[in-house]
UniProtKB/Swiss-Prot annotation:
Protein name: Apolipoprotein A-IV
An individual GO BP term: cholesterol efflux
Lineage: Eukaryota, Metazoa, Chordata, Craniata, Vertebrata
Record region (13 X 22 AA approximate tandem repeats): 33-330
The species this protein was found in: Leptonychotes weddellii
Stated family: Belongs to the apolipoprotein A1/A4/E family.
Post-translational modifications: Phosphorylation sites are present in the extracellular medium.
Amino acid sequence: MFLKAVVLTLSLVAVTGAQAEVSANQVATVVWDYFSQLSNNAKEAVEHLQKSELTQQLNALFQDKIGQVNTYTDNLQKKLVPFATELHERLRKDSEKLKEEIRKELEELRARLLPHADEVSRKIGDNMHELQQRLGPYAEELRTQVNTHAERLRNQLTAHAQRMETTLRQNVDNLQASLTPYADELKAKIDQNVEELKGHLTPYADELKVKIDQNVEDLRRSLAPYAQDVQEKLNHQLEGLAFQMKKNAEELKAKISANADELRQKLVPVAEVVRGKLRDNTEELQKSLAELSSHLDRQVEEFRRNVGPYGETFNKALLQQVEELRQKLGPYAGDVEDHLSFLEKDLRDKVNSFFSTLEEKENQDMLVAVPEPQLTPVPLES
């Protein structure tokens, strides 16, 4: 039985690795972006549903992300594309229906909260203050970490470039043999340092999600006494708020990662230029190394300036979303168009459920497919 468990574990690792290449989040984003794009176009374009175009976009996920075809990914692709296109159809049909449901939900909530409008507004205001207190240190810490790790990256790469300059002066007669290892190592150091930079900065988004859950739960408890007979409707609105706030956290993570990748893309070509000039004369190579150091300084400084303020921008966005909830629940809200966030949340929940169900079935199939090891009886000694 132990051997069977080991084989199963290894199989699961292989499946998980393959599945990670195409995630539920990626699929949901493709479907949602396509839906939003059609919704924003002219009516004639919306009526002409481009099923083939959506199918192409979904298939492109597999072409771009998966290096080799295996049973799991092939099965996933065959089942996913029809599911996602059908889901897109339902989005278009459910949009107006959900819009009306949310309108009625907010009407009932406002009517129930109206006698306590001032207290409700004050409670939400208190929650915004608590949220600001919780998030403030994270924004400052993110800026500090960006500065610290960007400076560390700059120092390490600059020191490497300086070692190349020293080697250049000491080995004028044999430049290519002396500097080729340094040039190769420089590119590796760029990749390594950028990955370390991402590794230090992107976990902030996950920590922020925990703070968001805490804050939304605090808000739910503080408003519960005023919404005793409409608690489910209040919970639904708070779920929508949490979804929007966590989406901002995911976008923060993606922006940090994208900026780090962009930094890498700007640094690597310069390192390759230096390597390509190892056969040139000493003067040309010295010029390239000087340009490399200057380029490192500029690009790292640009990264620091771009990413440093992200924390403050994120905090403002979350506070604005809580303020919008206060306005929605207030007596003078008017018509509020916020059903799309609930529609997107429902879409992502369905895609996550699809992936979970498929993964569970795949694991069960593997469990059945792995045979019990047969133990050969050992003859007793006579």
